[in-house]
Amino acid sequence: MLSAAVLCGVLALSGCDKDKEGSAARGPSPVSVVKVTRHDVPADMTWVAKTESSRAVEIYSRVNGFLDARKYTEGGMVNAGDVLFLMDKKPFEVQLSEAQASLDSSLAAHEVAKRNLNRIRPLAKLKALSQTDLDQAIGDFQTTAAAVSNAKAQVENAKLNLSYCTITSPVTGYASSALQTDGTYINMSNAHLATVYTMSPMWVTFSMSENEEAKINQEVKEGILRRPENHDYEVQLELAGGEIYPITGRVTFSSPNFNPSTGTFELRASFENPNNQLRPQQYVRAIVKGATYVNAIVVPQIAVQEGSKGHFVWVVTKDNKAQFRPVEVGNWIGNDWLIKNGLEEGDKVVTEGMMLLASEAPVKIVQEVDQKPAADDKAKK
């Protein structure tokens, strides 16, 4: 038994010696590194957003009556002034005729009162008629004049109601489907007939959470982040499938109110849409540009690993040894990662070959590049 134990020990020692010899034979591990430099980095932020017509005009009937006909193509483009619906005009034409007849009667009565007053006034001066007769004539003249004014107003009202039978679009845009069918009696309860959506400019709305706003404000306070002058943020749209919309927009509205039900603040950007490529209610990605990370450190995402205690990188020391370095990360910036703490300018961060590294293990740099700013990269929250 003793001989067997001694033999096993000898074999184990022999194996250890062979491992050391193998490690020494391999020599320093080859690695590629990026040399850390500080520079200003675009702090682009991305949100899921939704397109919205800048002017969605609901088309209502202003009069009660039967809907005669829809005159537009549902879902098609209409121009300002185009006829959308026709109401039955006949009842309103009758009302106009009645109002005109009433006006004619009032004008005739007023003309009689006027002539009567013109006869009575000189006779009253000669004392041929009493003051009472004159007062009565003046009263008749004024009463009939008021009746004429009222009759004229009734005619104008009848003309207005008749004009309301022709329902036109106040804006240029795409028209929805008709909400009422031909022949339906329209009143206050079903007067909404359609909606016309203006296509340019197009609004894009998105929401920033309370935590996101607090984080941005804190980074600005600490001098890490710089907002654009006058908060003039540019916005780029990424459409479904990854296509970038060719026209950039601007943030034009930031809600002063916090929405407690969603825990967010609403923001809105405006985009010109000359070719009607954008349609209302599309989901897009809004890439908000203009803010800058000041004097920042970024490293390739591939260099950053995550362990049980957080994120870390491997750094090559001055004596060419691997060093384990915990880091505090910020946002993704394209293919890079913002490093908030843990690295300094001049550090050499391993980007290839880190899988074979151990702390204080010798390494050999086979490729070294300076970290360059990527001006057009997109930051992800």
Briefly describe each language-model feature range:
Residues 1-29, 216-229, 374-381:
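N-terminal export/targeting signal detector
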Residues 25-64, 241, 245-248, 252-253:
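N-terminal beta-strand block that forms a small beta-sandwich/beta-barrel module immediately after a flexible targeting
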Residues 29-32, 191, 201-202, 208-256, ...:
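Beta-strand/loop subdomains of soluble extracytoplasmic proteins
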Residues 36, 42-46, 53, 58-188, ...:
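Amphipathic alpha-helical coiled-coil/rod segments that serve as protein-protein coupling scaffolds
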Residues 37-42, 238-246, 254-260, 268-295, ...:
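Hydrophobic alpha-helix/coiled-coil detector that fires on Leu/Ile/Phe-packed helical surfaces
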Residues 71, 77, 83, 89, ...:
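Exposed loop and linker-edge segments at protein-protein interfaces
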Residues 164, 257-266, 335-341, 375-377:
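Short, solvent-exposed secondary-structure boundary/capping segments
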Residues 235-236, 296-334, 369-381:
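Short beta-strand/loop micro-motif enriched in small hydrophobics and charged residues
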